[in-house]
Design a protein with these regions (language model features):
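Bacterial N-terminal signal peptides
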Residues: 6-17
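Positively charged n-region of N-terminal signal peptides that target proteins for export
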Residues: 1-5
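Glycine-rich, positively charged N-terminal anion/phosphate-binding segment
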Residues: 129
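Helix-loop "lid/cap" segments that line or gate small-molecule binding pockets
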Residues: 121-122, 135
Length: 341
């Protein structure tokens, strides 16, 4: 069943306040910086590097290991496993629509996709390489990569870490999911949502979720690249969910900035494709989407949402699932026999 919103509700939905500019569709393409325009050659190279486990110390972990683009762009683990079976401290966020974030990582420590791509290879838990020089040396020792770098960046000394990061970022900018039922609604098709999804949209606005989750990506307002949108979590530390799900054990952005004022501050995540990205929260402690809605209502809004409200909001979140871009595994250049010695 599809539902046409009554005019009174439409007026409320598009009224002043946080919801005024809220209902925006996801753009059909992701923005790219002036120094890294997206090209087919960069995307092809970036996809290869994204899938290549040889960028890790053990030759066993790739970007794809934690951000599975064949499904929801994450790994469905509370926290991810890296080299030598080590476990990270935070939930792997989805890579889908990451291109619409103005900063990257839960704590916003990377100002761009290009800089984010340089982080995991040298994280001692994730991919375990000693430094970025070691990463690019590993790539240079795979001769089959050089023609792809030259196609993407021209002749000369182009097999560099900066170019590798640019290529990965270019590929990630193709990982977007416009065209959801919600996007059709936001473009003017008021019959695109079911009755329950329409109620969920209204509840989402009425209870205050849009104070954080606004904009086309439902991750906050559009900001200049490198300027992140952060919110305190939990806002109401007396919520019983704080202890139940250990929500304050991680200092959040303060771990990156070393500023005590940033304790408990987190980059606001996207709500798109949530049905594909369980478990939830920065520590992956909440297993189901209805429970995540209850947790956020309590910790952020000091509200105990009814079962009906939770069900309607979850239905609305289902309308944020867009068609995923088709993905295939790339063929990688052959491995020299001494590469992983």
């Amino acid at each position: 069943m599809r539902y046409r919103l009554p005019s009174a509700i439409l007026l409320m939905t598009f009224a002043a306040g946080a919801a005024q500019a809220q209902w925006q569709p996801l753009p059909e393409s992701a923005p790219a910086p002036a120094d890294n325009p997206t090209t087919a050659a960069k995307v092809e190279l970036g996809k290869m590097l994204y899938f290549d486990p040889r960028l890790s110390a053990t030759g066993t972990v790739s970007c794809f290991s934690c951000h599975n683009v064949m499904e929801g762009g994450d790994d469905h683990m509370p926290t991810s496993a890296g080299v030598h079976g080590l476990k990270g401290g935070r939930n792997a966020p989805t890579v889908f629509n990451a291109a619409f974030h103005s900063v990257q990582f839960w704590d916003g420590r990377a100002p761009s996709l290009e800089e984010q791509a340089k982080g995991p290879p040298v994280n001692p838990i994730e991919m375990g390489m000693p430094n970025l020089d070691a990463v690019i040396d590993r790539i240079r020792h795979i001769p089959g990569y050089k023609p792809y770098f030259e196609q993407a960046f021209g002749a000369g000394d182009v097999v560099t870490m900066d170019n590798a990061a640019k290529a990965i970022a270019a590929y990630e900018r193709t990982l977007i999911t416009p065209g959801s039922a919600y996007d059709k609604f936001a473009k003017g098709d008021k019959t695109a949502l079911t009755a329950q999804q329409a109620r969920g949209l209204q509840t989402f606005a009425d209870v205050g979720c849009v104070s954080c989750h606004s904009g086309p990506n439902f991750s906050g307002p559009a900001l200049p690249q490198g300027e992140g949108f952060f919110m305190k979590f939990p806002t109401f530390p007396d919520s019983p969910y704080v202890v139940k799900y250990k929500l304050t054990e991680d200092p959040g952005r303060a771990a990156a900035t070393k500023d005590p004022a940033d304790t408990g501050m987190w980059r606001v995540p996207t709500l798109r494709n949530l049905v594909y990205t369980a478990p939830y929260m920065h520590n992956g402690a909440v297993k189901t989407l209805p429970e995540a809605v209850r947790v956020m209502g309590s910790t952020q809004l000091n509200k105990s949402l009814s079962d009906a409200e939770v069900a309607d909001i979850v239905a609305f979140f289902e309308s944020l699932t867009g068609p995923f871009p088709a993905q295939t595994m790339p063929r990688l250049p052959p491995t020299p026999g001494d590469l992983l010695e």
